[in-house]
Every structure is written in structure tokens, then in C-alpha cells.
């Protein structure tokens, strides 16, 4: 059985890890970095760029560079948070036929799981390069507060990337695993405060020793799946835009190129202000008008940044309060606070957390890597390589069905330990009702329409009977991934109907299979592109070396040879500009053939000169013998040293 890798599929950055010889190893990517930007770009020549290479060209290709797509995964286009995002990103967010939020790049509409799959493929390749063997299985992390649609969409992304997703695990739980594995035995309760690039989670986790096993039990979780570092960046971008408008009268909001430069600069300034008291944002030639180019230069202090984002930091405290209340624990009873996610490096965030929980957070957990490390540990548990760990996670939101009067009737309350199964008997609302619609909901509101609709299905052929008589047993079954399976049974006839909740949107199996095939086709295209690039490089190198050889040879090359070589060089240069690898190979061969006689001539000449040069070199030492002075020295022994 191959290795099961752990992947932290982040909004801003992703990370891949593996358990090796009992130790967790974070794997460096091809660029030598331990995290990879979760950015995918579609270049004009059809190449798909992922990670740092995509980030580098974002300024010149803003409409086709997709970032923070995790915030759209499993979301409907009409949702408020999606509508808000449309105004903030330079790429297009469009409405799919099924009502989901999709993205558009290079004129092609794509589902968010397809984009996330490109990042996962990069993570998969990173692990394969390190291990030297194919990787097909993974544990992927999601925010604890992700709903069923978002979890399902993440699993779909894994499938499209060619991965068998063995488990979807909550990010704070993964971080607690990474933290708790090497801690001393005994019970302790920890808070994991996870403020990442696009999402916020907080979990109360009890780490206990039960029958020699490390038991990680999530007592409660809460969060906000649309609050993270990207929002902090936006506050800074808005401030810079306003300052520039005050100074120059020009609005940069409608200039995608300028906004992309501002995004990069804002992120850099935010990071710098975690360690410095002030920084300069200096962007020359940010735009131009009739009077000439305009430059942006704004000094920002840490205090200014903190005033811009203070309310965002405060928004994270209420979920902490709710999580403690749901867990039935007082803040003073928390043993350790673990900070996860790059945004937790901000001093204001650290202070807010310390003030609320009454203790400083631990500094020995890497906020960028802990989640991937925990996922790798869970992978090793599933593979049987780690035996003494038991993970008890929870369902983050209440699950129920719509009943008479548009009411949501809960079946599984939030923070119920998973996997779990719960059944409840319902009946008909009308006399002789022949079918019932089971409308599955997720959320905390009493009014059904105010909750997230996960899907509907019908149980038909109910025998005629007065209202309230038929016995319809509805069963909710949540698996270890937090994904819901729902069944309904007419107790009188034994007739059943069941579904794995796929939401009233989401991707169908056919769509996923098509995307998997597309991804495989892309892999073939990528291979061809690499081969073409190698052929072009070989062609360019041969043109350069041949021209140099002809120049060095001077009049030793005949006019006919020169003409033939130049014609072959021009033909190869033309072929290199094209996309036909076979044509490049043919022209390389042709140039090699016509330049071979000259190369042989040069080689023969060098060989003829070589012995002569060698003889001279050997003669020189002989000539110098008369001048050699023998060194005078005494051997110093033992205590004679001076």
C-alpha cells in the first residue's frame, strides 16, 4: 500500500506532508518552499501555472489568475458572500447552470473544485517527486465550519486531481493532532484558533489518555467561512485607493492591473507590519493620465493598520465565546491556546486572543504547517502506521428536515460527535397523501428557508391513509468525513429511499468524471508542452553554439559551408518559434548534419596542436631545474618545539 499524504488545501497557501519513520515531514515544492500559493493562472499559450509561477505573473494577467477560490467552493452564486466577492476580485465569477458560483478564465467557465484540483495536483506531484513513487491517496483538510456542500466539493476536487480522498478532516482538529502527538501523557483541553487566508475556525479540543491511546475529542467548534487574511488585505487596499484618490483625484478601483499590484503590495505591507512599526508602500507608475504617469507612495504605521482591521479581529471573538459555551467550559479551564493560519502572526490578533482566553498562545506550533502535519498523522492512522490515536470530531452545524409550516426540525444537533446515526419518525400532513418530500437542511435557524438547503428527495407510493397515520422513519447518517447520508422508510410497506446528500447544486458524478478526464488530458498536454520546451531549448542552444563555432573558425569555413549552415540556422530559428516539436527535431538534425564537417575540421586542428602544446609544457619544468632552491629545514621532535 502506498503512502497516504496529508494536504492542507488553504485559501492563500497550501502545504503537503507525510509521516516517515515516525516523524512528520513537510515536503518542499520544486521551488524549495514549504508552502505553495493556492493560485492558478491560465497563460495565453494555454499553459496552466500553479503556485509561485502563477503568483509572479498575476500583475500582467489579472483576469486569468485565480486566487482565494476556496471561498467559492460549494457556494451558490446568489449567496451574499459570493456577491461581495465579485466586487473584490479581478477575475470573473459567473453563475453556473445549476446555480453554483463558478469562475471564468481564458473564456472558459470552470467549477471551483476544478481550480482547487490544480493546486492538489501540484501538492500530489510535490509528494511524488520527494517519495519517488506514485501517490494516489490523501487526507485533505477543510475549515471546521464548512457545510456539507463545501466538504463534498473538496472531495470532488481530490477526485479530479486523481486522488482517492481517504478522509476529510477539520483544520483545527488536524492542528491539535500535530500539537498533541508528542506531548506528555495526561488530560488537557486546548483551544485551536485558526485564522487563515479566507476562513476562521475555533475548536475546543480535549486531548486525553484513554486505555493507552491518545484520544482527541472535539467538544465544540464554531467559525466564519468568509473571514480571513484576504479581508485584512482588502481593508488595506481600500485605504491605499482612498489615499491615492485624495492625492491625485484618480480612482484605481476600476483598473485591474493597478489593483493586482496593490494586492501584492498590501499583503507585503501587512506582513512587514507584524514585525515593524511602520512601512512604505511605494508603487511607481501605478497609472497615468493626460499629465503623465502617476506614482503611489503611502507610509503606513502598525497603529493605522490595526485601526483598519480592528472590527475584523473582534469578529473572531464571538465564535470563541459560543464555542466555549457549547463545550460547557470556562476560558480559565483552557490549558493551551494554539494559533493556526498565517494571519495569527499579526500582533493585534495575538493580543485579542490572549486578552479573551487570559493566557498567551503557544509559540511552538508553526501556523503555516501544523494543519498539513496533522493531516499526515491522520493518514498514517488510516494506513495503520500509527496505532495509538483516536480522533473524535464533530458535526459543526445542526442537521434536520423541513416540517409543516416551514419549520426546521433538527435530527442531529451541532457539535455531535461523528460518525453518528439518528432516526426520527414523521407522518403525513394531508389525508391520503401519496408521497412525502424530504427536504434536508443545515443551520441553526428555526425557519427552514433561513438555513442552507442540502437537497431534496421524494418517498412515493405511500398507501392512502388519514393524515398523521403513516409512519415515515427518516434516518440521518454522518460518516467520518462529515458527509451526510439520508434515508426515509415507510414503516407500513418497508419501502425505502435514500441519497448521499449532493446538495441541490454541486457537481454530478458525470461532471466529475468529465473533469477527471480533462485533467488527465491536461497532464498529457503538459507532458507535450514540456517536450516542446525542451526541443526549443535544444534548438536555441544549437543555433548559438553553431554561430560561435563558425565565427571562431574564420576563413577555415568555405563560402559554400557558410551558406549551407546559415540557411539551416535560419530554418531552425523559424521552427523554434512554432509549436511543432517534430519540425524542430528535424531542423536540429539538419543543422547538426551541415555543421558536422566544420566541427570535425576544428576538432582535427585542435588535436594536431595538442601534442605540441603538451611538449612545451613538459619542457618548461626541465628548464627551471637550475633555478630550484632546496628548502632548508630541521625536523622538530617532541619537546623541542619552539
From Swiss-Prot:
Q: Where is the composition biased (Basic and acidic residues)?
A: 621-642
UniProt GO molecular function: ATP binding; ATP-dependent protein folding chaperone; unfolded protein binding
Q: Which Pfam families match?
A: HSP70
Renumbered to this chain, the Low complexity biased-composition regions fall at 604-620
Tell me the keywords, alphabetical order.
ATP-binding, Chaperone, Nucleotide-binding, Phosphoprotein, Stress response
Q: Does the keyword Nucleotide-binding apply?
A: yes
> Keyword Ribonucleoprotein: yes or no?
no
Q: Which domain of life is it from?
A: Bacteria
Q: Which residues form a coiled coil?
A: none
* Record-linked InterPro entries: ATPase_NBD, Chaperone_DnaK, Heat_shock_70_CS, HSP70_C_sf, HSP70_peptide-bd_sf, Hsp_70_fam
Modification Phosphothreonine occurs at = 199
Instruction: Tell me the segments the record calls region Disordered.
Output: 602-642
Induction line: By stress conditions e.g. heat shock.
Family membership: Belongs to the heat shock protein 70 family.
Task of the protein: Acts as a chaperone.
Please state what the protein is called. Chaperone protein DnaK
Q: Which organism is it from?
A: Pseudomonas putida (strain W619)
Amino acid at each position: 500500500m502506498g503512502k497516504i499524504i496529508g494536504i492542507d488545501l488553504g485559501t492563500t497557501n497550501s502545504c503537503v506532508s507525510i509521516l516517515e519513520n515516525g516523524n512528520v515531514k513537510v515536503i518542499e515544492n520544486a521551488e524549495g518552499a514549504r508552502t505553495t500559493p493556492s493560485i492558478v493562472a491560465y497563460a495565453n499559450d494555454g499553459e496552466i501555472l500553479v503556485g509561485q509561477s502563477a503568483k509572479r505573473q498575476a500583475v500582467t494577467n489579472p483576469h486569468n489568475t485565480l486566487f482565494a477560490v476556496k471561498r467559492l467552493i460549494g457556494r451558490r452564486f446568489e449567496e451574499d458572500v459570493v456577491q461581495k466577492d465579485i466586487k473584490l476580485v479581478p477575475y470573473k465569477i459567473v453563475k453556473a447552470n445549476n446555480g453554483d458560483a463558478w469562475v471564468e478564465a481564458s473564456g472558459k467557465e470552470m467549477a471551483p473544485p476544478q481550480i482547487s484540483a490544480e493546486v492538489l495536483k501540484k501538492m500530489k506531484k510535490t509528494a511524488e517527486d520527494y517519495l519517488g513513487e506514485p501517490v494516489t491517496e490523501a487526507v485533505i483538510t477543510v475549515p471546521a465550519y464548512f457545510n456539507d456542500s463545501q466538504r463534498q466539493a473538496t472531495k470532488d476536487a481530490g477526485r479530479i486531481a486523481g486522488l482517492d480522498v481517504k478522509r476529510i478532516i477539520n483544520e483545527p482538529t488536524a492542528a491539535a493532532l500535530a500539537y498533541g502527538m508528542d506531548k506528555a501523557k495526561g488530560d488537557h483541553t486546548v483551544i485551536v484558533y485558526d485564522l487563515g487566508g479566507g476562513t476562521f475556525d475555533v475548536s475546543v479540543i480535549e486531548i486525553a489518555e484513554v486505555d493507552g491511546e491518545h484520544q482527541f475529542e472535539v467538544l465544540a467548534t464554531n467559525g466564519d467561512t468568509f473571514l480571513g487574511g484576504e479581508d485584512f488585505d482588502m481593508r488595506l487596499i481600500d485605504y491605499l485607493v482612498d489615499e491615492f484618490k485624495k492625492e491625485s483625484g484618480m480612482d484605481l478601483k476600476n483598473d485591474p492591473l493597478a489593483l493586482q499590484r496593490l494586492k501584492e503590495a498590501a499583503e507585503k505591507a501587512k506582513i512587514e507590519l507584524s514585525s515593524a512599526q511602520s512601512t512604505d508602500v511605494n508603487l511607481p507608475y501605478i497609472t497615468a493620465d493626460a499629465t503623465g504617469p502617476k506614482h503611489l507612495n503611502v507610509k503606513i504605521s502598525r497603529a493605522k493598520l490595526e485601526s483598519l482591521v480592528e472590527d475584523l479581529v473582534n469578529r473572531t471573538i464571538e465564535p470563541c465565546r459560543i464555542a466555549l459555551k457549547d463545550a460547557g467550559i470556562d476560558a480559565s479551564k483552557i490549558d493551551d491556546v494554539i494559533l493556526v493560519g498565517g494571519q495569527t502572526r499579526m500582533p493585534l490578533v495575538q493580543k485579542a486572543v490572549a486578552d479573551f482566553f487570559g493566557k498567551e498562545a503557544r509559540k511552538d506550533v508553526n501556523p503555516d504547517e501544523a494543519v498539513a502535519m496533522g493531516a499526515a498523522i491522520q493518514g498514517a492512522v488510516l494506513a495503520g502506521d500509527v496505532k495509538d490515536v483516536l480522533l473524535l470530531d464533530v458535526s459543526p452545524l445542526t442537521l434536520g428536515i423541513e416540517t409543516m409550516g416551514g419549520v426546521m426540525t433538527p435530527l442531529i444537533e451541532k457539535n455531535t460527535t461523528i460518525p453518528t446515526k439518528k432516526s426520527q419518525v414523521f407522518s403525513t400532513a394531508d389525508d391520503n397523501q401519496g408521497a412525502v418530500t424530504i427536504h434536508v437542511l443545515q443551520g441553526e435557524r428555526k425557519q427552514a428557508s433561513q438555513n442552507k438547503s442540502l437537497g431534496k428527495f421524494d418517498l412515493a407510493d405511500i398507501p392512502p391513509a388519514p393524515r398523521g397515520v403513516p409512519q415515515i422513519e427518516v434516518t440521518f447518517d454522518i460518516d467520518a468525513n462529515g458527509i451526510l447520508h439520508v434515508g426515509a422508510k415507510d414503516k407500513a410497506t418497508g419501502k425505502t429511499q435514500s441519497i448521499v446528500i449532493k446538495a441541490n447544486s454541486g457537481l454530478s458524478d458525470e461532471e466529475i468524471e468529465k473533469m477527471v478526464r480533462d485533467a488527465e488530458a491536461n497532464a498529457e498536454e503538459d507532458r507535450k508542452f514540456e517536450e516542446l520546451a525542451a526541443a526549443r531549448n535544444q534548438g536555441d542552444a544549437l543555433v548559438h553554439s553553431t554561430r560561435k563555432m563558425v565565427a571562431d573558425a574564420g576563413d577555415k569555413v568555405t563560402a559554400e559551408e557558410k551558406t549551407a549552415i546559415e540557411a539551416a540556422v535560419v530554418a531552425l530559428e523559424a521552427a523554434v518559434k512554432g509549436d511543432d516539436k517534430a519540425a524542430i527535431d528535424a531542423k536540429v538534425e539538419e543543422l547538426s548534419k551541415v555543421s558536422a564537417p566544420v566541427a570535425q575540421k576544428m576538432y582535427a586542428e585542435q588535436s594536431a596542436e595538442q601534442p605540441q602544446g603538451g611538449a612545451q609544457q613538459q619542457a618548461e619544468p626541465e628548464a627551471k631545474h637550475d633555478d630550484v632552491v632546496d628548502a632548508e629545514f630541521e625536523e622538530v621532535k617532541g619537546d623541542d618545539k619552539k
